[in-house]
């Protein structure tokens, strides 16, 4: 029974890793990133909702005072 020839495995694995590294670098180079991130000021928008105009309280039946 012949043995498996593993003499070329090292160069195959190294070349595969190198090519994957190069491909990933080429993929990442397409992404644009900001060089200096600056904060943006967000303006608050006021939404008019009916429950903000008056104070309401919800009474549950079990919280009513006893007679």
Curated annotation (Swiss-Prot):
Tell me the keywords, alphabetical order.
Acetylation, ATP synthesis, CF(0), Hydrogen ion transport, Ion transport, Membrane, Mitochondrion, Transmembrane, Transmembrane helix, Transport
- N6-succinyllysine PTM positions read 54
Q: What transmembrane ranges does the database entry give?
A: 8-24
What GO CC annotations are associated with the protein? mitochondrial membrane; proton-transporting ATP synthase complex
Q: Name one GO biological process term.
A: proton motive force-driven ATP synthesis
Q: Which family does it belong to?
A: Belongs to the ATPase protein 8 family.
Q: What is this protein called?
A: ATP synthase F(0) complex subunit 8
Q: Which organism is it from?
A: Dasypus novemcinctus
């Amino acid at each position: 029974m012949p043995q498996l020839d593993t003499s070329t495995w090292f160069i195959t694995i190294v070349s595969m890793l190198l090519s994957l590294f190069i491909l990933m670098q080429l993929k990442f180079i397409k992404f644009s990133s900001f060089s200096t991130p600056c904060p943006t000021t967000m303006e608050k928008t006021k939404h008019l909702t009916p429950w903000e105009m008056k104070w309401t309280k919800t009474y549950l039946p079990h919280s009513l005072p006893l007679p």
